[in-house]
Amino acid sequence: MIEYRIATNDDIELLMSSRLEMLRVVNGLSNDYVFSDEIVRESREYFLHGDQLTVLVLDGSEVIGCASMSFMWIMPTFSHPTGRRAHLMNVYTRNEYRRQGIARKMVEMLIDATWAKGATEISLDATVMGRPLYESLGFKNSTECMVLAK
């Protein structure tokens, strides 16, 4: 039976295993790829103490999907009076479970929880494969953002 739930700190091992699996798949890495201590340490710290929500999807005891929402608090503006914004990240469903509405349900759960937390905007970086899902949920392209990377 498929179970959807918002993860808690008690789920840290499931969160970490799903995160590392997602990173391997998305980046085309082998199953035995060893991540840097920094990535593992910082991911664990973020799941335990970061301002985030993650949905886990389980089939029995096995994680088959995950999606995270990261929250930011910036100076309030007229269009964002709470200053609360969010960024949707790492929406992942195992290959054999795709095209069953799992990603949609995870994202809908996170959207509902995000509005309930007072956020006024959700951003995301869409892959080509994910774009139709996000558009069907009402996401639009934005020209507001510029990025400076180190």
Language-model region placement:
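Conserved GNAT acetyl-CoA-binding A-motif
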Residues: 107, 114-126
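A short beta-loop-alpha structural element at the N-terminal edge
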Residues: 3-17
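Conserved acetyl-CoA pyrophosphate-binding loop and the N-cap/start of the following alpha-helix
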Residues: 97-109
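A short helix-loop-beta-strand connector motif used in the catalytic cores of GNAT acetyltransferases and
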Residues: 44-56, 87
